[in-house]
Amino acid sequence: MNSYSLAERINSQVNASVTYKTDLAQYGTPEHWCLPYKFGDCEDYALLKRKLLLEQGWPTDKLGLCVCYMPSGEGHCVLWVDTDKGSFILDNNYAFPVKPSELPYKWESMLCDGVWQQLHGFA
């Protein structure tokens, strides 16, 4: 299986298995990053997708947790993946991997290989 197909499968699997629920509703706090069990918000989806891809042997330097802002101004977190078909975003709002340039987000920062970095001109 090529890397794009694996990313597509994991994205679909996680999006279907987790029901969106804010950290405030679930934990009583605005932010709580963890692996989801049935419920989670955007960073929980991204963390689970990252975990499942790593378990399949995906290189850590080809994955990044991205913090961004949606057009509404609300903070959001997605997973960046580098595949055999290029770079894509795995997002709980999309059923399929999306090119960063096709998303309406303002990119803030990315955690890749253990280092947070500012994103300038990412898309």
Protein language model features and the residues they cover:
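A structural boundary/capping signal
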Residues: M1-A123
